[in-house]
A protein has these predicted regions:
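Conserved class I S-adenosyl-L-methionine
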Residues: 1-34
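Class I SAM-dependent methyltransferase "Motif I" SAM/SAH-binding loop
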Residues: 40-44
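Class I SAM-dependent methyltransferase SAM/SAH-binding core
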Residues: 47-92
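A short acidic, Gly/Pro-enriched loop at the edge of an enzyme's catalytic core
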Residues: 94-101
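A conserved beta-strand element that flanks and buttresses the S-adenosyl-L-methionine
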Residues: 103-105
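A short glycine-rich, Lys/Arg-flanked "PGG" loop and its adjoining helix->strand segment in the class I
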Residues: 119-131
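SAM-dependent methyltransferase
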Residues: 136-199
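C-terminal lobe and adjacent flexible extensions of AdoMet/dcAdoMet transferase-like proteins
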Residues: 194-234
Length: 234
């Protein structure tokens, strides 16, 4: 059972304020053309707007509950025919097709807690790409003031939805707990520096095309967020 199953109905209200990445990923998909693969597709926060642009999305997620919500949302949006939703994970995505774009939005690679699993996941993403195809994803590494302001405290993220961040700066992990009327869960994320992500991408056989500081592709000059575009060499 995925940690997200118990908050599948809560997920959209919990993440409703996260919108800054949607247009970026939609544009990347339009540039690549159908089909695209979205890893950790969740409830379709990005996949459904992508499909609304006429792009076929192969969406992979390890949570049956999240996929169920995604299917229902896609039906309401009138794009269910463009979404091919499959149960699977980052390490072995069940995709036989080879595509020009694989995405892994909303920091989902941070669920991988060691370099072995990170390399496995990056290698799996690479195997889905045609030569010249691109992997696009975003991650973060927390700033000291964020850790200080949030550590060990229940904070109301959205009305009636609370989250608690427990940071371990030695292990570089975040244990995040979420609770609301629709459910509760706890999961662990692990962060790396940009230099470490670059090294892993290169070790996995990618050529890094860009490391940006935000979804408008501003140059990375320090800060918490990094947005990566990497290519499978031809």
């Amino acid at each position: 059972m995925s940690a997200y199953d118990s908050i599948a109905e809560l997920y959209d209200p919990w993440s409703r304020s996260v919108t800054e990445d949607v247009a970026f990923y939609v544009e990347e998909a339009k540039r690549a053309g159908s089909p695209v693969v979205e890893l950790a597709v969740g409830t379709g926060r990005i996949a459904i707007p992508t499909a609304a642009e006429g792009i076929r999305v192969i969406g992979i997620d390890s949570s049956p509950g999240m996929l169920e919500v995604c299917r229902a949302r896609a039906e309401l949006a009138g794009v269910a025919g463009l979404l091919d939703l499959r149960l699977g994970d980052l390490l072995e995505p069940p995709v036989e097709e080879r595509v020009r774009l694989v995405t892994c939005p909303f920091r989902s690679y941070l669920h991988l807690l060691d370099d072995d699993s990170r390399l496995r996941a990056l290698g799996a993403a690479r195997s889905l790409l045609v030569p010249g195809g691109r992997l696009v994803f975003d991650v973060f590494a927390p700033a000291a003031d964020d850790i200080e302001e949030t550590h060990g405290r229940w904070l109301e993220r959205e009305p009636g939805i609370f989250e608690r961040a427990d940071w371990d700066t030695n292990a570089r992990t975040l244990t995040l707990s979420v609770r609301g009327e629709g459910g509760a869960t706890t999961f662990t994320l692990a962060w790396l520096s940009p230099d470490e992500w670059r090294a892993l991408l290169e070790k996995a056989g990618f050529q890094v095309l860009g490391c940006y500081g935000w979804f408008d592709k501003r140059p990375y000059r320090g800060g918490e967020d990094t947005v990566w575009i990497a290519r499978r060499p031809r």
